[in-house]
Each structure stands twice: as C-alpha cells, then as structure tokens.
Amino acid sequence: SGLVGSEMCIRDRTLLERAGCQVEVPNTQTCCGQPAYNSGDRTSAKDLARQVIDAFLGYDHVVAPSGSCAAMIAHHYPALFDDDPEYRGRAEALAAKTHELVSFLTDVLGVKDVDAAYEGSVTYHDSCSGLRELGVKAQPRALLGTVQGLTLTELEDSEVCCGFGGTFCVKYPDISTRMVSDKAKRVQDSGAGTLLAGDMGCLLNMAGRLKREGSTVRVRHVAEVLAGMTHDVPPIGDGTS
C-alpha cells in the first residue's frame, strides 16, 4: 500500500490491517506524475511513472487514498509506454492491481462494516476521478452507514466538480473560484457539521473556501472517520490543533 504523510499512513494502515492486510510503504515511491501528465509534460510523467512502477510492481495490491492518483496509475500509465514494450507490460500489470482505498476495502476485500463511531452529521462530496474513472460512489456511503452515531446527509450536486481539478484551478482560477464557492454554499446548505471526501486535492480546495467564508464546517478525509481516528487527527485547514 502506498501512502504519503504520517497521519495518512497511520489512518490508512489502520483500516487495511483491520481488514487483514500486511501493509508496506516503500521509501522509493514518488509522485504519480499526474500534474506533469495533465500539463502535457509526458517526459517527466514517464520518468515518475517508471519510479512508481519499479517501487510497487512486486506487491499483490497497490492502494491509494486518492481517486486521482489511483486513476492515473490504473488508466493512464499503460499508454505512456506505447513506445516501450517492456514498461508497457509492467504498467499494465501495475494498473490491474491498483485501487482507491475505500473501493479496495469493499470491492476487493469484501468489508461490510467498520468498528468506528462519530457523533454528528456528515455530508459527502464525490471527487471527479474517483467517481468517473473508478466508479467510487456507493462504497464510502455503505461503510459510513455502519459508523455508530453518524448521520449522513446527502449533498446537493454531490457529483459536481469542486473546481480543483489538479492544474485546472491554476489554468482557470476565476472559473475554479466560482465552482468552489458554489460547492461551499451547497455544503453549508446541507446543515451537516462535517464534510467528507476521498481525495485530498478536493478536500484542501473546499476547506480553504469554507474557512475563507467563515464556515464552522469541519473537513475530513473519509478514511479518518472510517478508522475512528477523528480524535487523533485535526480537521483539514484547522491550524489551531
């Protein structure tokens, strides 16, 4: 399992080990290369992809707590190596065993419930890559439904982009700002005390907008709630904890 950041690593390792997995985090891993890929820099994207392939190919499964990273590996790596048969084969092998975290828990391991509690109401944003490239929609909701004390309030337009879109927010900042402002309004209109999602880029984007608007809505990665670690990890954007 490839994870970045100590809190993320502990959170995701906890979920995977509870499900019976032996988890390793190779030190040789690097960025998946998506920013370079989306910017048209195929040379840099291929260099990074080779490092990722070499770091992870020997594992049974590769799990990422980000739909965008998992989708990059699963759907875009093989085509990067159309002119390199050796790495094309390796990329295809890695793509076949790469999964988004919550999808892996439910669809591959068959996890039906989690041992966690969270008092309060939450709403859920469906990130573009997880939803559209990997089919992640029902899986997080199914597991959240087993968290003691949690009430899930569906977010209006939950499938609409938050405006982050990787390099999109840099290329089209005005459009991106309008989109995240609309998303923040939907979140606040939901009445939920906590916003959850499965992709850190989306979460950082939405947390920043909500904070600038003075909202008290907490923003968290869905895995923090599923792992029962909300008392150990501050909400995203909370600089006081």
Regions found by a protein language model. Give the residues of each.
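Short, flexible loop segments at boundaries between secondary-structure elements
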Residues: R88-L109, D157, E213-S241
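Short, small-residue-biased leader/transition segments that mark boundaries at the very start
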Residues: G2-V4, M8-I10
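Anionic-ligand binding region
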Residues: G130-L152
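A short, acidic, amphipathic alpha-helical segment used as a generic capping/interface helix at domain edges
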Residues: I175-G191
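N-terminal glycine-rich anion-binding loops that anchor highly charged ligand groups
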Residues: E17-Q29
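Local cysteine-cluster metal-coordination motifs and their immediate loop/turn environment
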Residues: S6, T28-S39, A64-H75, H125-L134, ...
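Short, structured active-site "lid" loops
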Residues: S39-P65, Y172-I175
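Glycine/small-residue-rich loop that forms an oxyanion/phosphate-binding "nest" at active or ligand-binding sites
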Residues: F56, A64-A96
